[in-house]
Amino acid sequence: MEGFFWKTLLVVGALAIGGTSSLPHKPLTYEEAVDLAVSIYNSKSGEDSLYRLLEAVPPPEWDPLSESNQELNFTIKETVCLVAEERSLEECDFQEDGAIMGCTGYYFFGESPPVLVLTCKPVGEEEEQKQEEGNEEEKEVEKEEKEEDEKDQPRRVKRFKKFFKKLKNSVKKRAKKFFKKPRVIGVSIPF
């Protein structure tokens, strides 16, 4: 009888071990993954205001049980709540003119613990910059034409001035783009 008990215990133990999940992480639905990413953005971005999910479209290939990399794409918007208040996001309304951020995140579930890399940048900022740059260029061209008409300078001097102004504008644009980097956050996720 004693041998039967140990054999039974061995079989039950083997089944229990084989029946447990071999995943190194807790399975996440797309909604849970996005909520976690928004929470991490709010805690690590250094912003004064909390951001809340505006839109998220789950990709058809999202697999909560996958051990491979998973991609997130979502949009968040600034709320009236401050980070220091530590309020629930459900209590926070969107700001009327709040900043809207387009975010892309990558979960690396193959790592132990899993890692999230999140990149968020303002939506529509590129279009606004192009419009501003176009307006500035037009104003400068008009200003240059007026200056050239007023002064009676040799043609060579005018060409050099025009060239250096274009060069100066180009450097300004590149400097603006360089210093307006999107926020990138990387964290490991303990499950």
Swiss-Prot record:
Where does the UniProt entry say this protein principally localizes?
secreted
InterPro entries xref list: Cathelicidin-like (IPR001894), Cystatin_sf (IPR046350)
Which keywords accompany this UniProt record?
A: Antibiotic, Antimicrobial, Cleavage on pair of basic residues, Disulfide bond, Membrane, Secreted, Signal, Target cell membrane, Target membrane
Q: Where are the transmembrane segments?
A: none
Which Pfam families has this protein been placed in? Answer: Cathelicidins
GO CC annotation: what is one? membrane
Q: In which tissues is it expressed?
A: Expressed by the venom gland.
Q: Would the keyword Ligase turn up in this protein's UniProt record?
A: no
Q: Where is this region: Disordered?
A: 125-154
Top-level taxon of the source organism: Eukaryota
Sorted alphabetically, the Gene Ontology BP terms of this entry are: defense response to bacterium; defense response to fungus; innate immune response; killing of cells of another organism
Q: Does the keyword Transport apply?
A: no
User: Which residues lie in Acidic residues bias regions?
Assistant: 125-151
Indicate the family of this protein: Belongs to the cathelicidin family.
Protein name (record) = Cathelicidin-related peptide Oh-Cath
Supply the source organism's classification: Eukaryota, Metazoa, Chordata, Craniata, Vertebrata
